[in-house]
Amino acid sequence: FWIFGNNVEDKLGKIRFSIFLLIIGFLSIGVHTIINFNSLVPVVGASGVVSGIMGAYVYLFPNAKLLVLVPFGILFPTTIKARTFMYFWFISQLFIALGSSNISWEAHIGGFLFGYLTIKLSKYTRYNL
């Protein structure tokens, strides 16, 4: 959460960030509910909100460099741009969707897309870090 959240909060301010979290929470669980309308399985967690923060972050800071650990037999540290990281993360969510999983990929994808679009439509300035 704080890898991306603190930067988004700094940009939006505490009040707007709190409102953003509530909106993305409702929208991400809404996507999950629409896709799984007849399911009786409860959903617990805030991963849709975290995904929304990631969507907001990649819109605001697409060129920010992230230090990541890539598994090539051992963990290999490298830096990549935020948009590249988010691209691979988003693709991983689609692969989760293809398999049978107890992970709410619908909330992840919905949260990410709504987070990205909410910030984009709010016309916040992008930063080229």
Please tell me what each predicted stretch does.
Residues 1-129:
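A detector for small-residue-rich transmembrane helices and their helix-helix packing motifs
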